[in-house]
Amino acid sequence: MRLKVLWVGKTQEEWVRRGIDEYAGRIGRYMSIDLAEARDEKGAAVEAMREREGERLLKLLPKNARLVLLDERGEQMSSPELARFLATNRDGGTQELVFVIGGAYGFSDSLRAKAFKTISLSRMTFTHQMVRIFLLEQLYRGFTIINGEPYHH
């Protein structure tokens, strides 16, 4: 299985980039990971921005990808539950598992329609920049749980 994480907009802060690089490198010890960003849309009506960003994200999706959206209204999982989800997909023959962090106004209906699952990291609201690090850390934590390593206690 290949892992891909997509998001909308450039990573603005250097310290966020360092965090992304750190956790992507750690994940790479367990599985191939690809990170990609779609250009964010500015200056249009909210629905138009969602649609344009959705189109850009759809173009970045590999064929046969199993799509997981991150949304505050999604299903909340514990770290062990996320680990089981990762293991089930890996062992069940999923070729590409793609996690997507949307833009400031969320996801287009066309992207939501393609989603296999929608999850939430928390009921709290975080910046889209911070969510990148939080998601990657949780994916790394999931792989350490799968492998019985002491990172998660």
UniProtKB/Swiss-Prot annotation:
It holds the Pfam family SPOUT_MTase. It catalyses: pseudouridine(1915) in 23S rRNA + S-adenosyl-L-methionine = N(3)-methylpseudouridine(1915) in 23S rRNA + S-adenosyl-L-homocysteine + H(+). Its EC number is 2.1.1.177. It is found in: Cytoplasm. The keyword Hydrolase does not apply. The keyword Transferase applies. It is an enzyme of class 2 (transferase). Keywords: Cytoplasm, Methyltransferase, rRNA processing, S-adenosyl-L-methionine, Transferase. InterPro entries: Alpha/beta_knot_MTases (IPR029028), RlmH-like (IPR003742), tRNA_m1G_MTases_N (IPR029026). PANTHER family: METHYLTRANSFERASE, RIBOSOMAL RNA LARGE SUBUNIT METHYLTRANSFERASE H. Specifically methylates the pseudouridine at position 1915 (m3Psi1915) in 23S rRNA. HAMAP family: 23SrRNA_methyltr_H (MF_00658). This is Ribosomal RNA large subunit methyltransferase H. It comes from Geotalea daltonii (strain DSM 22248 / JCM 15807 / FRC-32) (Geobacter daltonii). The gene is rlmH.
